[in-house]
Structure formats: C-alpha cells, structure tokens
Amino acid sequence: MTHKKQKKEMSDSEKKTFNEDSKHSILAVDLVRLILERLSFVDFHRARCVSSIWYIASKTVIGVTNPTTPWLILFPKGDVEIKKDSCKLYDPHENKTYIVRDLGFDLVTSRCLASSGSWFLMLDHRTEFHLLNLFTRVRIPLPSLESTRGSDIKIGNAVLWVDEQRKDYLVVWNISSLFGYHKKGDDRWKVFKPLENERCIIAMVFKENKLYVLSVDGNVDVFYFSGNDSPVRCATLPSSPLRKGHKVVVTLSGEVLIIVAKVEPYPRTRLCFFAVYKMDPKSSRWETIKSLAGEALILDLGITVEAKVMKNCIYFSNDQFHRYNENSLWNVSNKSGVFVYHFRSANVVQLVELLTASSRTSKILFKDARCFFPTFTSKWLL
C-alpha cells in the first residue's frame, strides 16, 4: 500500500516537472517569435536554423513567405586575388545587398549554368558538376563528365529542377544536339540524342516535367520526363522563321513564347529591343504580341511570373544579353548591370543599380548577375 502511494506521489512530481518544462518551452517560443517578427527576410531565415525552438517559432510567424520578386546573384570576377569563395546577393524589394562568404570553393573558376529556387547548378573545371544552396551551404556532388565524353567539353545549355518538398532534383544539359540528364539516385549521366537531323540547341527551359528545346532550325520540341523512364518527345511546334538572338519561354498558363533580342546599332546609346512571339493556334504561325498579360518575364529562368507592380516587363542582365545575342548594351563599366525592359514605355530599357564594384567593407569585385527566386521550404536534399 505504501509502495503504491509512493509510486503515485512520484508520478505527480514528474507530472508537475513536465508541466513546468512545457510552460518554459511555450514562453521560449513566444519570446523567439517576438524576435523573429522584427527581423528582415534574410535574417529571419538565418535565425530559424538556430535550434528546434527557433524553427518551431518561425512556423507561427504570419506574413513571412518566399519572395515574389526575383533576387540577383553576382559572382566574383576572374581577376580577384582574394575571397574567391564569396558572392553577392541583392534583394530589390528591401533594396539590400548581402555578401555570402567562405563557401569553401573557388567561384571564379566555376561556372553557374542554371538555378532552381535557392539551388544553383555549378560546373567546376569543365567536368565537375555540383548543386549548391547558398543559404544552407549544402553542396551535392554530381557525377563527373570525364566518363561521358572526355575533358574537351563545352556545355551549351543546362536546366535545373528542384522539388524541396519531395527532396528530388533533375539536371539536363546539352552539347550540340546531344543531351545528358541526371536524376537523384543515379550513379551516372544518362545520354540521349533525339534530334539527329537538327543542329545545335539555342535554349532550353524545364517546367512541370517537360523540357522545352529550341533549336537553331527554329523548331520547339517538348520532351516529357517521368520517373525512371527515358524522356519521350510529346510535342513539336511548327518551325519559327527566327534565326538569331532568341530564347524559349514558358508562361504561367503553359504557353510557349520565343523572345528575340536586338541591339540598336548606335554605339552611344546601345539600346536594346525585345520582340515576343506566340503561336497562333488558328494559323499555326508565330505572331508578335505587345503585352505579357500582366506578367513579368525572367529571361534567365525562361519563365513568366505573376507581377503586382512591374508588369509587362523583361528582367535580364547585360552579361546574359551578351551570352544570347553576342552584343553588349552600355559601356564596359556597366556590363554587369541588370536591366528591366518595359513594353509600355516606348521600349525603354531601365537600369537596376547594383554595387558591382568593391566598397569600403569589401574588396571583392563582382560580375555576371543572374536572377533567382530564393526559397526556404527545406534544409537539404540529401
């Protein structure tokens, strides 16, 4: 009888201790939430990784979502002698810049091929691929290309698709009309060559399990990726008469656009113009359109996004424009600038100011600005 009573008293004591610990945990979450609500977007997502309590508290903060305006990333220039493992991020919504330091590898000798959310597809020393998340600093090595085709390789285009909820990813690249792809879990690159009679590929974009391929012949071929099966060609759009300086884009509704970029021949102005073409379903011809239906076009990603303020605009960089059109816009000092092209303002290109040069606090010079949409829905893909 005494033993049972003592056992009951011990249980009551343990219950009291548990209740006190629960109150302290709730109090800690409330205090952390107050701190998180005062932080900027980047600091908020840094702080949520401090501990499990901070992560739990972050889920209760209302109004913090992934950005709907594209951010910009700039990589260090090739002539930099120090800090080659750092890059700069720019948030246009808050007009703030952030330098991500000590990533652990040389970004100067690496080449960024594509991005998906906060993940970047990097190619190092021409044959070594890896995925990099700048915020979590997770780096995922991919199979080397040396076993595929040797060291003399020049990647034409590449796309990256990442599903952070399912922890899945897909990488596709091309060399002329040869395609290579790698899915999570594969131990090597798989190769296919579906365009035997066509020349090199100009541009690619991946959306909703479909790879849209624009060839120099003006054809747009669509390939469907499903599970472990090989990609299957599911559509071919009529050939476009356009031959130079263009890119394929997929809109929010799934429509395919072809973008043609041109530079005014006057060296003092160096203004550019964009023509946007969409397939007319009745005539099966590519027709010019004058509006993006209130959406914004991200040339780097090959997609359109919903726009609340900067509607009917094209986001692009001078480095990117040179890659696609073999022409630069303004003078050399502005070659790393990022621009916004407005359809409704007499085809005027407006410069988005960036600190591409070094500052008092940083001696790093940056170049090659790219647009991306940061996401913080998951910690890693491994």
Curated annotation (Swiss-Prot):
User: Which tissue types show expression of this protein?
Assistant: Expressed in seedlings, leaves, stems, flower buds and flowers.
- In this chain the Kelch repeats are located at 73-117, 159-209, 259-306
Q: Does the keyword Disulfide bond apply?
A: no
| Keyword Endoplasmic reticulum in record | no
Keyword annotations of the record: Brassinosteroid signaling pathway, Cytoplasm, Kelch repeat, Nucleus, Repeat, Ubl conjugation pathway
Q: Disrupted gene: resulting phenotype?
A: Abolished brassinosteroid (BR)-induced ASK7/BIN2/SK21 degradation, and severe BR-insensitivity. Suppression of the constitutive BR-response phenotype in the dominant mutant bzr1-1D, and accumulation of phosphorylated BZR1.
Annotated localization: Cytoplasm; Nucleus, Nucleolus
**Residues annotated as domain F-box:** 22-69
Q: What is its main location?
A: cytoplasm
Q: Which domain of life is it from?
A: Eukaryota
Which Pfam families does the UniProt record give? Answer: Beta-prop_KIB1-4, F-box
What does the entry give for GO biological process?
brassinosteroid mediated signaling pathway; positive regulation of brassinosteroid mediated signaling pathway; protein ubiquitination; ubiquitin-dependent protein catabolic process
Its Gene Ontology cellular component terms are: cytoplasm; nucleolus; SCF ubiquitin ligase complex
GO MF annotation terms:
ubiquitin protein ligase activity
Q: What does this protein do?
A: Component of SCF(ASK-cullin-F-box) E3 ubiquitin ligase complexes, which may mediate the ubiquitination and subsequent proteasomal degradation of target proteins. Required for brassinosteroid (BR) signal transduction. Mediates ASK7/BIN2/SK21 inactivation both by competing with substrate binding (e.g. BZR1) and by promoting its ubiquitination and subsequent proteasomal degradation.
Protein name as catalogued:
F-box/kelch-repeat protein KIB1
Which source organism?
Arabidopsis thaliana
**Lineage from the top down?**
Eukaryota, Viridiplantae, Streptophyta, Embryophyta, Tracheophyta
Gene this chain is encoded by? KIB1
